[in-house]
């Protein structure tokens, strides 16, 4: 019985699918808030909300280890949301997102 309990406890880490997401924001005067999401074991997302009174141009660069970075761009109107997603060929261990926003002209 003791061995069965130890075996069951050893499987618990395998059930965790969450991974850390690190965001490096560079907002440059735009009023954009963000929240991250882990969608699956090989897919991540960032939800952007424009809280300002002017449109914002945003670029998100998703990095997962040695894979090629995925770049997502968009213009977010005032009071609107935008969801940027990226899917990778490998499981994500730690996702790094470089977020750059500026006021649209």
Residue ranges of model-derived segments:
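Secreted/extracellular small peptides and ectodomain modules produced from precursors
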Residues: 3-4, 56, 99
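Sec-dependent N-terminal signal peptides
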Residues: 4-14
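Transition segment at domain starts
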Residues: 16-38
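Terminal connector regions
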Residues: 25, 85-105
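Structural beta-strand segments of beta-rich domains
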Residues: 42-46
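Asparagine-centered strand-capping/turn motif at beta-strand->loop junctions
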Residues: 48-54
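Short, hydrophobic/aromatic beta-strand segments
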Residues: 55-61
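Intrinsically disordered, low-complexity Pro/Gly/Ser/Thr-rich segments with frequent PxxP/GP/PP motifs
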Residues: 65-92
